[in-house]
Design a protein with these regions (language model features):
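Secreted/periplasmic carbohydrate-active enzymes, especially glycoside hydrolases
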Residues: 1-155, 159-168, 204-210, 219-220
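Aromatic- and acidic-residue-enriched carbohydrate-binding clefts of CAZyme catalytic domains
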Residues: 113-116, 170-209, 213
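Solvent-exposed loop/turn segments at secondary-structure junctions
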Residues: 151-153, 174-177, 225-226
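Catalytic-core segments of hydrolase enzymes
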Residues: 213-214, 219-225
Length: 226
């Protein structure tokens, strides 16, 4: 999504570089306009990855990652830029004869061996402490982390899971936060009752999914707890 924060219309180029190849797409934005710009392999052949390096979890293969550099240029000058890291993998689920859900990673069954994660109660975790904890998970020969809530004060811990090959079963905002979200008290059964409440919570979940959507480590969102 591109946003023109200025009071004047602008014309520029959205430039992307992936694996040493570059594409450029012209974009026009009115003053104050936000626009979702979709680019597929039809417009940019560089996005068609032939024989991609697949992302695998710990003990199943390498956790291959790609990096795409994006920039928006106006009259040849960079207005904004960002590097997006992502992985290529396929995740599917299935049910056993007993009715339990299982997962397939790149077509192969994966036995999920998971640790649980909660943030430090005073939010004192740093990138260094996050990395130490993620390394502990790997050293215990586990391949997954279950975030009961949408933990992590930034994307750092999710970046680490991508790098170290740990599957992520991410949660959602817990019941005790709903009072602040909804602006009213909730009983033991929750407080999402009106259409307005439902729309608010749906937008909240949508924003969280968009925030983390590029992480190959994330294989499922569990909106229920325990």
């Amino acid at each position: 999504q591109l946003t023109n924060e200025s009071e004047q219309a602008v014309k520029g180029q959205l430039i992307g570089t992936l694996e040493g190849k570059t594409f450029s797409i012209p974009v026009s934005l009115a003053a104050g306009e936000s626009k979702i710009v979709r680019v597929t392999s039809k417009e940019a052949d560089v996005l068609h990855l032939k024989n991609p390096r697949l992302w695998w979890c710990h003990n199943m293969g390498k956790s291959e990652m790609y990096g795409m550099d994006l920039a928006f240029e106006i009259d040849g000058k960079v207005s904004d830029k960002e590097t997006i890291n992502f992985g290529v993998r396929e995740v599917r689920d299935y049910f056993t004869e007993e009715g339990y859900r299982g997962f397939l990673l790149n077509g192969k069954k994966v036995l999920v061996r998971s640790a649980g994660w909660t943030d430090d109660i005073f939010l004192r975790d740093t990138p260094a402490s996050n990395e130490i904890q993620v390394q502990y998970v790997r050293d215990m020969n586990l391949n997954s982390i279950r975030f009961e809530n949408i933990w992590g004060t930034s994307q750092n811990v999710y970046d680490l899971c991508d790098r170290y090959g740990l599957l992520v079963l991410v949660g959602w905002s817990c019941h005790w936060e709903w009072d602040n979200y909804l602006g009213s008290s909730c009983d033991e059964f929750g407080g999402i009752k009106s259409e307005k409440d439902m729309n608010l919570i749906a937008r909240s979940l949508n924003d969280q999914v968009l925030w983390l959507r590029n992480h190959p480590a994330i294989i499922a969102w569990f909106v229920g707890s325990d």
